[in-house]
Each structure stands twice: as structure tokens, then as C-alpha cells.
A protein has these predicted regions:
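Residue-level signature of mid-helix packing/kink "hotspots" within the transmembrane helices
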Residues: 16, 45-53, 168-169, 301-309
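Extracytoplasmic
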Residues: 2-34, 273-278
């Protein structure tokens, strides 16, 4: 789980660099407004969603080890490519450096050109980032299925999924400071390079349980305990592991729709906060992410998501207390979690209250 945890942490760090730097550092240079940033994040989300439809097949086809390497390699390259958008924009519009870009009169035709050209370069880099990041969770879930029996997979998933929370926690503590000290370009490069470091460890550390020298016979037996089980009166075992299910057939399963409904209710809220909270705090209250108060507020916001570790334990608790099968226990837990984001509606009446 440690490698999966760190991969997911890097995944969310890379995803957060733009949201934590655009308003304070990037917008003045490229003359952006909310339209440009909103379009970039929307296209990223769409590409990410579409790529997720095929990422699982890609991981199955490449194998867990190679598939994960490809995924994190592509998204790390995409993350680093953001740093080149300034140079590309300068070359396109014929200006020598970032200072010249910022010196262009706001509202002029040249400023509009700079904004549009830079936006398209960022969209290109963002699409590559989305292409690679889409492979993280399918690969991590596949590794979890290889190393844990069904009853333990929810908890194992919550552990690596907590990497998203840790990434979101550390992002406001590090990224604005990097951008303030060395420029927003270095923030993308430094954070993006973490993925290449992870790849070096993955090459040497990952092996399937049956091939891993540190997995003994008793542990292997525990891992494989439910590879032979009875489902609807039929024995399901290793001989059926190679069976392929088409994408369209998955839409006929109630499990697919239950999972999609749960994600629909939670992910929209999470991504909205992820992309827009830093900008909102700056525009509404004048709180900059590179300052102490901004860091503290963002850190507090994301600290709450650490509860996801305990959330992954809930299905196991339900199984032990009620005797439900793993699927039913997970669906019950997911239903509970799906309604929790609705609590954010209670914050609306407090929107006009100042923190001072």
C-alpha cells in the first residue's frame, strides 16, 4: 500500500499546482480571467473522465507493473510540460520574456492574444496530465486486488486513497512557497519530477504476491482465500480470471450504476473545492495562498478529508457486525458517504460572514 499511497499523493500534488498558482502568479503574466482558467479545468475534467473509460483496459493489457509505469510517466511529463507554456507563449507572440508579457496593457488586443495562446498551451499540457492520471486509480485498485482478499480491499483502498488527502494537504504548504521563491514554472517541474522518482522505486519494489520473496506461504494463502467461492450456485475460481467483460455489458450490472451514482454525488463537490477554493479565498477575502493565513485555511479544509482512512474501514465493520457480504456492505457504506457532501449546503448562509 505504501507505493500506491505515494503515487496517489503525487497524483494530487500534480493536479493541484495549477489551482494554487494561477490566480496569484500565472494570471498576471498571461492576462487570464476566470473564463480561461475555468475552460482549462473543464477540459481537463472531460479528458480525465473519458480516459478513465479506457484506463482499466490499458492496465489489464500492459500488466500492473508496466501499466502503472506508463501512467505515472505520462502524467509526470504532462505536469512538467506546464512549465514550458510561458516560453511557448513568448515565442508565439514574439515577446522576449515573462516581464514583457506582464507589461502588455490589460484589455488590449495583444493581451487577449496572450491569454488565448497561453490557455491553449496549458490545455495541451493539461490533457497529457489527464491522460496519465486516469491510470492511477485503476492500477492501484488492480494491485489491491492482487494483494488483499475481498473483505480487506475496502480498507486497503482507503489507505492508498488517503494519498489524495495527503497530496491536497501538502499542496498548499509547498506549492505556493515554491512558486514564490523560484517561479511558478519551478513549482510544476519540482512536483512533476516526484513521479519520476516514484518510478525508480516501483521498478525494483513491485512483484506479484506469488513471485515476491517476502510473501510467505501463509500470507499467500490468506491473500488467495476467496479466489474460489460460490456465487449464485456456481464456483468461481482461477480458471475464470481471464474472462473479459465488454464495456457495454458492465452497464447491465446494478453494481456499475450504484458506484457511478455514489461517485456522482461526491466527486463533483470534491473537485469543485479542489479547483476553485484557492481562487475564491483570494478574490473574496484577499487571502493569498503564499501567505500564512491562506495556507492555514486550505490546510484546515483538506485536513477533514483524512477521515477517508476511517471511511474505508466502515464496510469491514458492517461485515463483522451484520454478516452482510462485501458488496452489500460497501454499497451501504457508499450510500452513507454519498449524502455527506450535502452538508456543504449549510455553509451557504455563512457566505457573507467575514473571518475578521
Amino acid at each position: 500500500c505504501a507505493m500506491l499511497f505515494f503515487a496517489t499523493t503525487v497524483n494530487y500534488l500534480d493536479r493541484q499546482v495549477l489551482s494554487l498558482t494561477w490566480d496569484e502568479f500565472i494570471k498576471p503574466e498571461f492576462h487570464w480571467n476566470e473564463y480561461h482558467y475555468g475552460l482549462i479545468t473543464s477540459i481537463f475534467s472531460i479528458v480525465y473522465a473519458v480516459c478513465m473509460l479506457f484506463a482499466g483496459r490499458f492496465i489489464d493489457w500492459m500488466g500492473t507493473k508496466k501499466g502503472y509505469l506508463w501512467a505515472i510517466g505520462v502524467w509526470s511529463m504532462g505536469a512538467c510540460m506546464h512549465a514550458l507554456c510561458g516560453i511557448a507563449t513568448e515565442a508565439w507572440v514574439g515577446l522576449p520574456d515573462a516581464a514583457a508579457l506582464r507589461a502588455v496593457e490589460a484589455g488590449s488586443a495583444l493581451a487577449a492574444t496572450i491569454a488565448m495562446v497561453s490557455m491553449y498551451f496549458f490545455i495541451a499540457a493539461r490533457c497529457i496530465l489527464a491522460l496519465g492520471e486516469a491510470g492511477n486509480f485503476p492500477a492501484a485498485i488492480k494491485v489491491t486486488a492482487e494483494y488483499f482478499p475481498k473483505k480487506d480491499r475496502a480498507y486497503a483502498t482507503s489507505i492508498f486513497n488517503a494519498g489524495a488527502s495527503i497530496g491536497a494537504l501538502f499542496a498548499p504548504l509547498t506549492i505556493p512557497l515554491l512558486a514564490k521563491a523560484w517561479g511558478w514554472e519551478m513549482a510544476f517541474i519540482v512536483i512533476g519530477a516526484l513521479g519520476f522518482v516514484w518510478m525508480g522505486f516501483w521498478v525494483f519494489m513491485y512483484k506479484k504476491p506469488s513471485d515476491h520473496p517476502k510473501v510467505n506461504a501463509a500470507e499467500l494463502e490468506y491473500i488467495e482465500q476467496d479466489q474460489h467461492e460460490v456465487v449464485d450456485g456456481e464456483t468461481v475460481g482461477k480458471e475464470q480470471e481471464g474472462e473479459k467483460i465488454s464495456f457495454w455489458r458492465t452497464l447491465s450490472f446494478k453494481q456499475t450504476w450504484a458506484f457511478a451514482f455514489g461517485k456522482f454525488m461526491t466527486d463533483g463537490v470534491w473537485w469543485f473545492f479542489l479547483f476553485w477554493t484557492p481562487s475564491y479565498l483570494n478574490s473574496q477575502f484577499g487571502i493569498k495562498m503564499s501567505e500564512g493565513l491562506g495556507v492555514a485555511l486550505i490546510f484546515t479544509l483538506y485536513a477533514i478529508t483524512m477521515l477517508s482512512i476511517y471511511g474505508g474501514k466502515l464496510p469491514t465493520i458492517i461485515i463483522n457486525k451484520t454478516g452482510l457480504n462485501p458488496y452489500a456492505a460497501r454499497m451501504r457504506a457508499m450510500l452513507i458517504f454519498a449524502f455527506i457532501p450535502l452538508l456543504v449546503l449549510l455553509a451557504q448562509p455563512m457566505g457573507t460572514v467575514s473571518y475578521t
